[in-house]
């Protein structure tokens, strides 16, 4: 494993561990400010887990378990959710604190107040960009799966719906990601393997998003 990937993995594990601890120590009742996005993130995680479980059952003769697949992060070099959502308590570079405390105005419904810190806005925007990338990938893959004469598996509207709901709650304007199209005849076996890889990666990202929302709600 290359040093950069190892460093990112360590940072991700530290963030998840810290956010998990913060959530366990916090009051269970969600605060009114972050409740909308916390609710949406919980739905997102539930949909991600259910969709992955269903895919593993349907594709039981395919390499679709966590141990069998080649893990891939499609958001790599495109977003920086782990870094942007790192709690201030874990930041060692004090020169960054002033910019992190700067207030900005947001348009999303995640916060009761549209005024939030620069770093919280950056964190939420990065989550939005993650969701947008996965949304495009899922739609592209679903279009291929629907072409399969066997109609063995395809994504239902639930997972696409919860992604869209959280994106609407975050409400960031950004460039449209074009949906990929190919003139080649789709390889349905490879597409189903790719679906497994994508669902495993999305579940991990959904866990991160849910823990970030829980932490923000508690703080």
UniProtKB/Swiss-Prot annotation:
Keyword Disulfide bond on entry: yes
Extract the Pfam families matched here: IL12
What residue stretch is flagged as signal peptide? 1-22
Q: Which residues are glycosylated?
A: 24, 93, 107
Entry GO terms, CC: extracellular space
Task: List locations, semicolon-separated.
Answer: Secreted
Q: Which GO terms of the molecular function aspect are on file?
A: cytokine activity; growth factor activity; interleukin-12 receptor binding
Q: Which GO terms describe its biological process?
A: immune response
Which branch of life, at top level? Eukaryota
The record's section on InterPro entries has:
4_helix_cytokine-like_core, IL-12, IL-12_alpha
- The keyword DNA damage belongs to this UniProt entry's keyword annotation: no
Key words, A-Z? Cytokine, Disulfide bond, Glycoprotein, Growth factor, Secreted, Signal
Query: Where are the disulfide bridges?
Result: 37-110, 64-196, 85-123
Subunit field text: Heterodimer with IL12B; disulfide-linked. This heterodimer is known as interleukin IL-12. Heterodimer with EBI3/IL27B; not disulfide-linked. This heterodimer is known as interleukin IL-35. Interacts with NBR1; this interaction promotes IL-12 secretion.
Q: Which family does it belong to?
A: Belongs to the IL-6 superfamily.
Question: What is its biological role?
Answer: Heterodimerizes with IL12B to form the IL-12 cytokine or with EBI3/IL27B to form the IL-35 cytokine. IL-12 is primarily produced by professional antigen-presenting cells (APCs) such as B-cells and dendritic cells (DCs) as well as macrophages and granulocytes and regulates T-cell and natural killer-cell responses, induces the production of interferon-gamma (IFN-gamma), favors the differentiation of T-helper 1 (Th1) cells and is an important link between innate resistance and adaptive immunity.
Please state what the protein is called. Interleukin-12 subunit alpha
Q: Which source organism does the UniProt entry give? A: Cercocebus atys (Sooty mangabey)
Report which gene this protein is encoded by. Answer: IL12A
């Amino acid at each position: 494993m290359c040093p950069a990937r190892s460093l990112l993995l360590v940072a991700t594990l530290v963030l998840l561990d810290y956010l998990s601890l913060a959530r366990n120590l916090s009051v269970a009742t969600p605060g009114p400010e972050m409740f909308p996005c916390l609710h949406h993130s919980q739905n997102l995680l539930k949909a991600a887990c259910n969709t992955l479980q269903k895919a593993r059952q349907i594709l039981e003769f395919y390499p679709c378990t966590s141990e069998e697949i080649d893990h891939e992060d499609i958001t790599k070099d495109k977003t920086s959710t782990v870094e942007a959502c790192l709690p201030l308590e874990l930041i060692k570079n004090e020169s960054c604190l002033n910019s992190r405390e700067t207030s900005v105005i947001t348009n999303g419904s995640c916060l009761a107040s549209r005024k939030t810190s620069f770093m919280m806005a950056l964190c939420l925007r990065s989550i939005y960009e993650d969701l947008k990338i996965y949304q495009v990938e899922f739609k592209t893959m679903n279009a291929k799966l629907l072409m399969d004469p066997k109609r063995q598996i395809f994504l239902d509207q639930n997972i696409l719906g919860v992604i869209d709901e959280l994106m609407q709650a975050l409400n960031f304007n950004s460039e449209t990601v074009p949906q990929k199209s190919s003139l080649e005849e789709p390889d349905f076996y490879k597409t189903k393997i790719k679906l497994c890889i994508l669902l495993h990666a999305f579940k991990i990202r959904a866990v991160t998003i849910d823990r970030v929302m829980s932490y923000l709600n508690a703080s």
